[in-house]
Structure formats: C-alpha cells, structure tokens
Amino acid sequence: MILEIVIIIAAVLAVGYIVNLCEDIVKRGNDREMSFRESMDLADLPVVTFYQGDKKFNFLLDTGSNYSHISKEVAKEIQGEIIETKAKVSGLGEGTTSGVCRTTLSYKGVNYDIDLSVTDHLTDAFASIKAETGVQVHGLIGNQFFQKHKYVLDFEKLVAYTKK
C-alpha cells in the first residue's frame, strides 16, 4: 500500500517535471522573439538592435508610428534600394520623406525585409535621444513592420514576439 502511494507520487512528480520542461522548450523555441529588456533597463526606451552584415543599427519600437523611418545620414549607411518619392510626415515635428529605402535587416539570424521612410527631420531627434540617454538610435520601427511580421509587443516581459 505505501509502495503504491510512493509510486503514484513519483509518477505525478515526473509528469509535472516533463510538462514544465516542455513549456520551457516551447517558450525558448520562439526564435522570432525580440527582447528590448536591456535597452529599457539602460535608457527606458524600447530599442532593438538589427544587423546588416557587421553593421549595427538601433531601432526604437514606435507603436505610435504607422511606418518605419530612418534619417538621411543613416540611409547613406544602410544598403538598400532607394525609391524616390516625397510625402508629408507628421509626428516628431513636421517633415517630408525624401524616399523609401527598401532593405533587409537581421535580428538573431532572422532576415526581415523592411521599407524605411527616409525622413528629413529625424537627425536632430536622434541626436537629442543620444544626448539624454546615451543610446544612439538609427531609426524607428512602426506598426507596418509589426503587422507585416505578425509581432505583438509585451511591455510586461519587455519582448516583441510572433504568435505561431
């Protein structure tokens, strides 16, 4: 009788351990998760670092922006196709775009095709962010990116993730 109870308890504990292990594997298995915990701890800004080759580009996750933006200076550094269009932009002051840079950036080995509006007035805004926080921001990632790649921002866990 006691042996049967011990076996049942051991079996229940083993099943619980396996379930927890599987949950951890599933959580870690989301290779499309983007953490902005480090930047929030450092500067209280949701910033994610993308790469293009060996170059690093820090992008502020901006849920208030429909589109993703870079400055003219950053457009010179990023490899991509510039599509010449002009459009009025509202938000961080008034400005116009001098085109769209269609490029590919990577995060943790995953490539993302992204259209970045080249926005005239962002240089001063990025300089101000750097002066106040010490973080060099190269661009803004807007809602179009989150929708295209099906990202959800979780500000409790400080991650952007895709639902599988």
Where are these regions (language model features)?
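Pepsin/retropepsin-fold aspartyl endopeptidases
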Residues: M1-K164
